[in-house]
A protein has these predicted regions:
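Alpha-helical recognition/docking segments in bacterial nutrient-uptake
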Residues: 1, 65, 71-166
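Short beta-strand segments enriched in small/hydrophobic residues
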Residues: 17-22, 56-69, 167, 175-181
Length: 322
């Protein structure tokens, strides 16, 4: 099949090639000319060559997305939100997985920053100082991380924690084991701070574990060695590991122990029992972040978006045992 060229569109529309280029890239042409060129381009099935368009506009039409672990369904959902929104606005996305390594995050930021129009960065581990030194605030948006001076999209972590604590309190729980994430993780610090501010409960922090299913398996034994009647996990993968370990040791959930996760990934509804979890708008965060990056939102000068969270109650949380 012969590919339609910009010259074909120009001939059919009765205009010059440069006029077609301006019409298709937002340049200065009359509304009537733009409409006529777009109609012809659509009728002929013309697909602009992104590289050639970049020579005209100085932009690549591509964006970068950096995530710490694509095996975690949380970040897979974020990526879905980014790519779906990018497709809707005719952009491509290069995705890099940094394997929870802050050095790799900064290296990927440098590489993608040179080769794309902007970068969406999920960076749980890199320090604020390193991010401020490496990231261009005009072409970088942080996802699920806040660093003063850089645009960001974050979830209302404190609000989600408060909902989870209210839920467990209403069920009679006063001794709650918190299986925290990595100590250098921004999200882990935010969640622990929100829990510590909750008051009226005995918080039993269990830290130093990986934010993974295997980390949750190890946490299950620590929970059973504590006086806790409920567990709040750093994320759903950890919570699912806890559930698995409790089941292996004959502990019935929620009759003997309640378990609450954070993120509400798709696996949460498939566990046994289904996992109560704080829902974070993962794909929406990706879409909002992309809009911030492309300047499509009319956001405040701080360029920060805070997205609401909500507790999804399922069968893993119940009344505290006497």
């Amino acid at each position: 099949m012969v590919r339609t060229t910009v010259q074909d569109v120009a001939r059919a529309a009765g205009v010059s090639v440069s006029t077609v280029s301006r019409a298709l890239t937002g340049g200065i042409v009359s509304p009537a000319t733009r409409e006529a060129v777009l109609e012809v381009a659509t009728r002929l099935g013309y697909q602009p060559n992104r590289a050639a368009r970049g020579l005209i506009t100085g932009r690549t039409g591509n964006l970068g997305l950096i995530v710490p672990d694509l095996r975690n369904p949380f970040f897979a959902d974020v990526a879905k939100g980014v790519t779906a929104r990018a497709r809707a606005v005719d952009h491509g996305v290069f995705i890099t997985d940094t394997d929870e390594d802050p050095v790799a995050e900064l290296e990927a930021l440098a590489t993608l920053g040179r080769n794309t129009d902007g970068v969406l960065l999920c960076s749980p581990r890199a320090s604020d100082a390193d991010l401020l030194a490496a990231a261009d605030p005009e072409s970088t948006v942080l996802l699920h991380r806040r660093v003063p001076g850089l645009p960001s999209v974050v979830a209302d972590i404190a609000g989600g924690i408060r909902q989870a604590v209210r839920h467990l309190r209403a069920l009679g729980h006063r001794r709650i084991a918190y299986v925290s994430g990595p100590e250098d993780s921004w999200a882990a610090q935010q969640r622990l701070a929100a829990l510590s501010a909750a008051g009226d409960l005995e918080l039993l922090p269990l830290g130093g574990l990986a934010p993974t299913f295997d980390g949750g398996l190890l946490a299950g034994d620590l929970v059973l060695d504590s006086p806790a009647t409920a567990v709040l996990a750093y994320n759903d993968l950890v919570a699912l590991g806890v559930l698995h370990r409790l089941a292996a040791r004959g502990v019935v959930v929620p009759e003997r122990m309640s378990v609450v996760g954070f993120d509400d990934v798709s696996l949460a509804a498939m566990s046994h029992p289904p996992l109560t979890s704080v829902a974070v708008p993962k794909d929406r965060a990706g879409a909002v972040g992309l809009d911030l990056l492309l300047g499509r939102t009319g956001a405040t000068t701080e360029r920060e978006a805070v997205l609401p969270t909500g507790l999804v109650v399922r069968a893993s949380s119940g009344v505290a045992r006497p």
